[in-house]
Amino acid sequence: MSPYLAAEDLSMFGTDPWWLVVIKAVFCFAFLMVTVLFSIVWERKVVAWMQLRIGPNRHGPWGMLQSLADGIKLMLKEDVIVKRADKAVYVLAPIVAAIPAFMAIAVIPFGPAGNEVSIFGHRTAMQLTDLPIAMLFILAVASVGIYGIVLAGWSSGSTYPLLGGLRSCAQMISYEIAMGAAFASVFLYSGSMSTSEIVAQQDDRWYIVLLPVSFILYIVTMVGETNRAPFDMPESEGDLVGGFNTEYSSIKFAMFMLAEYVNMVTVSAVATTLFLGGWRAPWPISTFWEGANHGWWPLLWFVVKVQLLLFFFIWLRGTLPRVRYDQLMKLGWKVLIPVSLVWLMLVATVRALRNENYGFSDIALYIGGGVLVLLLLSFLVDMYRDKGGKAADQPAETGTGTGTGTETAFDPMAGGFPVPPMPGQQVPPVPRRRPRRERELIVSGGPDTHSDGPAGGPTDGKEASDG
């Protein structure tokens, strides 16, 4: 071993023997895979019930092995590589998308930080490793997964995957800003970026009660990060066929699907850790039963909370329609990011006042006064904005200034593209190719040009059939 490496303090990575670390790593991988297999079947069952269907019921008891059968089927299919694809990047893209999805689970605690469980005679914590900057690690590996999606769209050599990859990149980058602000508010309030320490700080009250705005922000951003309905614009079948993975098949397509569902499990585990008390038992159980947070019981509470959040994903898919791309970007940049920044400043102010030993009543008074001032300023800005808008719209209502009193014609392209049809709007029809007899000929050359044709009538078969 290098003397420089031996001199470093590696205790933050744990003191478990290497074989125990391997066992815990295999457990984390198996936990993700089993949860994904169950979540796929559960999603198909729940959506089928919501749509008054039966759902999968052929493979295994109650169709529980359907996702396993689908995975085997995909692996046995022909692996087609597009002729115009950049083969090296085309093959690496699913791997780049799948590997970061598994990495974040390494710092998620499944149980108390103390040595609570025994594995082959060794006392160990139910966590693979913990880092002083665990939250930054989660945010970093979530960002790396974007590269796999973008490279998949770019290397496919097709227009639709490229558009899907660009959409996904813009969407995930936009929503990661608000997600990072939600993370920052949590470790500002708790005073630590360690996941196990954040769970320990929720001994009295969960952060869903103390930081409700951060929880709502994270719930919205985690749906956008995973490209799930109603934010599944990168996979929009109506305009992108299948999205960034249109040209993929066999095991490569399965890896993209695996990465999507593993990301769902990972973000649900992160939400459980940050806002729902992590491995802690719910309030009534932990109050009347002290042993609920010891032994292997914390693993049960953690899994139940993760499954509830996965059901939230499924419920969104079966309930809400897909939003437009401009609405998606507007929500991210004009709503989530400003709200997250304002909320982050409020949380930082509360933290500073707590460090100065201010009481709860003083903090509530200062924060309440600041919120009232912000609301008053926003009201004044909206009021002056409405006045300016009415003054600008008045000439359009009275006419063009010529005294005729006619209304200005509505330009459907005035606000940019796309512009949805407004109530009462009359959009001019798309020009079509009309028969020669109904067209007005415009002489732009000699009489014997190909567009004019002979005087006797049309020359091409299409125009003859139109006539």
From Swiss-Prot:
Localization of this protein: Cell membrane
Keyword Lipoprotein attributed: no
Domain of life according to the entry: Bacteria
InterPro entries: NADH_UbQ_OxRdtase_su1/FPO (IPR001694), NADH_UbQ_OxRdtase_su1_CS (IPR018086)
GO molecular function annotations of the record: oxidoreductase activity, acting on NAD(P)H, quinone or similar compound as acceptor; quinone binding
Pro residues: bias regions: 418-430
EC numbers on record: 7.1.1.-
Alphabetical UniProt keywords: Cell membrane, Membrane, NAD, Quinone, Translocase, Transmembrane, Transmembrane helix, Ubiquinone
Residues passing through the membrane, by range: 18-38, 88-108, 131-151, 172-192, 206-226, 256-276, 296-316, 328-348, 363-383
GO cellular component labels: plasma membrane
Region span, Disordered: 389-467
Catalytic activity: a quinone + NADH + 5 H(+)(in) = a quinol + NAD(+) + 4 H(+)(out)
Pfam family, one: NADHdh
GO biological process: aerobic respiration
Quaternary structure and partners: NDH-1 is composed of 14 different subunits. Subunits NuoA, H, J, K, L, M, N constitute the membrane sector of the complex.
Function: NDH-1 shuttles electrons from NADH, via FMN and iron-sulfur (Fe-S) centers, to quinones in the respiratory chain. The immediate electron acceptor for the enzyme in this species is believed to be ubiquinone. Couples the redox reaction to proton translocation (for every two electrons transferred, four hydrogen ions are translocated across the cytoplasmic membrane), and thus conserves the redox energy in a proton gradient. This subunit may bind ubiquinone.
UniProt name for this protein: NADH-quinone oxidoreductase subunit H
Organism the protein comes from: Streptomyces coelicolor (strain ATCC BAA-471 / A3(2) / M145)
Originating gene: nuoH
